[in-house]
Design a protein with these regions (language model features):
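Internal anion-binding site segments
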Residues: 1-76
């Protein structure tokens, strides 16, 4: 099973993600960080979700850090 989202204008399936202990006041859907630790996204209730593994349309399943090497996503 996977969730589907859009990252940097690309449709992606999310296969692995974790809710972090951190909180945020950013609007849901805001990219908080994108790097070797994965992609951190603001969610409802001030929670933060880290995307760890994903698959872009037409691509192969990979770690988020590997995806970011070819598809940088701006924070904000």
């Amino acid at each position: 099973p996977a969730a589907v989202t859009e990252l940097g204008g690309n449709r992606c399936k999310v296969f692995s993600a974790s809710v972090l202990g951190a909180t945020t006041s950013a609007a849901p859907g805001t990219i908080l960080a994108a790097g070797k630790e994965g992609i951190q996204v603001a969610c409802g209730g001030g929670t933060v979700l880290r995307i760890d593994e994903l698959q872009a349309d037409g691509g192969k399943r990979m770690k988020a850090a590997d995806y970011l090497r070819g598809h940088p996503i701006p924070v904000g």
